[in-house]
């Protein structure tokens, strides 16, 4: 196997496949020293636990090396209106008499905050707490760390069985560097060189790549991790790109890496997505700095205006920080696997990082490649099933992102008004009609695996405020006592954890052996 391109996609692929197949599969990574990585995807899904468990990596092994922090969820600011915020946590919704607690909240809300009333994790985010006690035990006592269960299940197989209570933020470049060492130590060949050409055989399959200093590099299976260039899949093999721009117009970003004194400031355990005039700003807390960026649509805002807005948002700490302007290719390749070439990462597809899906797309693609790994006869059905799984995930995430905008009540300028009138992906209008009658469930969300459970949809709809759902009529005829006890249980558990958990900074500092 030849992986063209390093970065997070290339080295996650190399490390995972080497762990899966050992010496039975020869892996070469060809990586240019001149081409930088995009590095937008610094936040993750909680399902990333499967990746590290599969590689048998403990948090203390890799987190300090990658300036990693915990992520208990996403805080959305200004999506309903300026000054309003809500959380989308990693926490399964509690049921009462078969109805989600959010439904009971619609019937008789204890306060005006569905997130802190129905979930524990948003309370810990607002208190700046670690998800682990100082002895390493998880705050979520209902979750059993499953060890081999996580390592031996794919993300799609695990969904719905339990919810790991957090994900991570990390520096993508540092994770790639860490995984480079991990993979090379286990026998992956690392070739630092520029690929000058891709040569095809008479069938149109890739025969070899031509490099500047190492000549021809041959392989049976080629993995395209060349980013938005799509050097192998799109350029050499001519696979078309399917744009999502008709429904997701944000196509640009400007990013800053801002050094900060985290001991003084503290570290919030969540990603923040702050809605702005022509898009939104991400804030990702790392150990020692904050990654931040403005995702916007160039039809509404110039790069200069975007950078100025971002610097004003960050404040004086951004004064001497160099800005990185990124042109994003939003959509997916029509096929992510053609002939003997599989694209993973940005060359396969990308959407704006509103739900931290960049790393998730990579991880899912790797799992599916192992699941559908080609035999000697290159059965086309394996390829077709892989392409279907990857397309469903990306199309499902596309739909979920559209809901963020269609479901946000904010409409204070042309950009936000236009989010309510753009065309919807096929089937979404009917689903929205269902959600105006009842909250999303497994029967009414996007029907194929895409990494997101119904409670995530509930949070976006209830937080955004534009698509209103009434409480189920049955609740008026049902005893209210059990629901009130459940609200009290959430409140009590949140208070207990606020009082007993260390701060996020303290836990991470102690992991690094620092004095606090």
Curated annotation (Swiss-Prot):
| Catalytic reaction equation(s) | 7-chloro-L-tryptophan + FADH2 + chloride + O2 = 6,7-dichloro-L-tryptophan + FAD + 2 H2O
- Entry's Pfam families? Trp_halogenase
- What is the enzyme's class at the highest EC level? oxidoreductase
Q: Which cysteines are joined by disulfide bonds?
A: none
Q: Which UniProt keywords apply?
A: FAD, Flavoprotein, Nucleotide-binding, Oxidoreductase
Q: Which PANTHER family match?
A: FAD-BINDING PROTEIN, FLAVIN-DEPENDENT TRYPTOPHAN HALOGENASE
Q: What is this protein called?
A: 7-chloro-L-tryptophan 6-halogenase KtzR
Its source organism is: Kutzneria sp. (strain 744)
